[in-house]
């Protein structure tokens, strides 16, 4: 893997929570590369450091030590305004609980942040928003408030918002954690489609069925990358075999 095809490079990342005595380690020397166009899943038991890793590599939290580069930019070298802009334009986010403003429609919740993040004219951004709403099957819900749609529909709106500025990488943090099995499948179908279009995707999940969609899975234990498994490209035809392979591997790790 060369620097030119690496979207995310994390080197010797450490994170300590110094509010405790002695300090509690969150990350302990993590090295991670994500290639352009790759779908990577991060797994691990509760408290293994999955969420801490995502917060640090996305720039939402600073590491105690180590280095993070996204799109060739060193996060430590960016000022607050630059880091904020990076998170709006270079990175897309899909969280377990979608963070939308209750007084705005689905369309405006996607449109307004994008207008702040991009120099494009409103007409161009709106066209992009409408295209994404249609692509993910929620164009008929665009004028509704977030309280009027289901959890799965809201997550598809989150995916639209994550993609509207055409980011280099999308971070999905337990995006199906509060959904039923059918809706989980629909959201994962949408994320798999996003990856199929060439978008780099990093998924944090506790669900092996979701992780089986990824090309590569890394396993965190006590803040360290403990193991890694390559699955290759996902297809519907091989889904059951992939899930079985991944479950067997995870069982061997004590998951």
Residue spans for each PLM region:
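The feature captures the beta-strand-to-loop junction immediately N-terminal to the Walker
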Residues: 43-45
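Conserved ABC transporter NBD signature motif
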Residues: 66-74
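Conserved ABC ATPase "signature" region
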Residues: 73-74, 122-141
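Conserved ABC ATPase signature
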Residues: 145-149, 153
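Conserved catalytic motifs of ABC-family nucleotide-binding domains
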Residues: 166
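Catalytic Walker B motif of ABC-type/P-loop ATPase nucleotide-binding domains
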Residues: 170-173
């Amino acid at each position: 893997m060369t620097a030119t095809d690496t979207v995310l490079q994390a080197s010797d990342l450490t994170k300590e929570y110094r509010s405790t005595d002695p300090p509690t380690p969150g990350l302990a020397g993590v090295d991670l590369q994500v290639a352009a166009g790759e779908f990577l899943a991060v797994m691990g038991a509760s408290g293994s450091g999955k969420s801490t890793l995502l917060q640090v590599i996305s720039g939402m939290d600073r590491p105690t030590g180590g280095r993070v580069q996204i799109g060739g930019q060193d996060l430590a070298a960016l000022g607050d305004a630059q880091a904020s802009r990076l998170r709006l334009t270079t990175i897309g986010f899909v969280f377990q609980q979608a963070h939308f403003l209750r007084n705005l429609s689905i369309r405006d919740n996607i449109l307004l942040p994008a207008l702040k993040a991009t120099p494009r004219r409103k007409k161009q951004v709106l066209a992009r928003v409408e295209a994404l709403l249609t692509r993910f099957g929620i164009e008929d819900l665009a004028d509704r408030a977030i309280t009027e749609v289901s959890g799965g529909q809201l997550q598809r709106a989150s995916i639209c918002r994550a993609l509207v500025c055409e980011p280099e990488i999308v971070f999905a943090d337990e995006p199906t954690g509060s959904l039923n099995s059918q809706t989980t499948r629909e959201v994962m179908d949408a994320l798999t489609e996003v990856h199929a279009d060439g978008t780099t995707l990093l998924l944090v999940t506790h669900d092996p069925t979701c992780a089986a969609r990824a090309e590569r899975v890394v396993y965190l234990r006590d803040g360290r990358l403990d193991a890694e498994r390559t699955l290759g490209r996902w297809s519907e035809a091989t889904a059951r075999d992939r899930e079985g392979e991944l479950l067997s591997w995870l069982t061997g790790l004590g998951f």
